[in-house]
UniProtKB/Swiss-Prot annotation:
A Pfam family that the UniProt record links to this protein: Ribosomal_S11
Family: Belongs to the universal ribosomal protein uS11 family.
Record localization: Plastid, Chloroplast
Protein name in UniProt: Small ribosomal subunit protein uS11c
Gene Ontology terms: biological process: translation
Record keywords: Chloroplast, Plastid, Ribonucleoprotein, Ribosomal protein, RNA-binding, rRNA-binding
One CC-aspect GO term: ribosome
The keyword Transport is assigned to this record: no
Main location: plastid
One GO MF term attached to the UniProt entry: structural constituent of ribosome
Domain of life of the source: Eukaryota
Oligomer status and interactors: Part of the 30S ribosomal subunit.
Species this chain originates from: Cyanidium caldarium (Red alga)
Gene: rps11
InterPro entries listed in its UniProt record: Ribosomal_uS11 (IPR001971), Ribosomal_uS11_bac-type (IPR019981), Ribosomal_uS11_CS (IPR018102), Ribosomal_uS11_sf (IPR036967)
């Protein structure tokens, strides 16, 4: 007879000393992702996962609360130093960076990776209020 081995449902958490933070900020939402130096995702959070819906996902407060949730997950993992990459023109950029500065994690670099077209596709019409 064959024995069936039980698989453990608990994942082993690996301590990550250096982390890469990617902040993708659009007008509708801000997504904050933490990866290790190889690009494997450790944790992520966004305005939508924090309970904000609709237009409130794009606010700086939603970005700040998502960032604070991610910081808590990073501190549990034992992360000490981080590199930050910021992408997009949204309002959550500055508040996310400010939250990381006050968190106690050592910021090694902040890089802006927003792509700018060399007269590519036509942008959408101007927003009407």
């Amino acid at each position: 007879m064959l024995k069936q081995s039980k698989k453990s449902s608990k994942k082993l958490k690996k301590s990550v000393i250096d982390g890469l933070i990617i902040i993708n900020s659009t007008f509708n939402n801000t997504i904050v992702t933490a990866t290790d130096c190889y690009g494997k995702v450790i944790a992520w959070a966004s305005g939508g996962t924090e309970g904000f819906k609709g237009a409130k996902k794009g606010t700086p407060f939603a970005a700040q609360s998502a960032t604070e949730k991610l910081i808590k997950a990073l501190l549990e993992q034992g992360t000490q130093r981080i590199h930050i990459s910021v992408s997009g023109p949204g309002p959550g950029r500055e508040t996310s960076i400010r939250s990381f500065q006050t968190s106690g994690l050592q910021i090694i670099s902040i890089k802006d990776i927003t792509s700018v077209p060399f007269n590519g596709c036509r942008p959408p019409k101007k927003r009407r209020i």
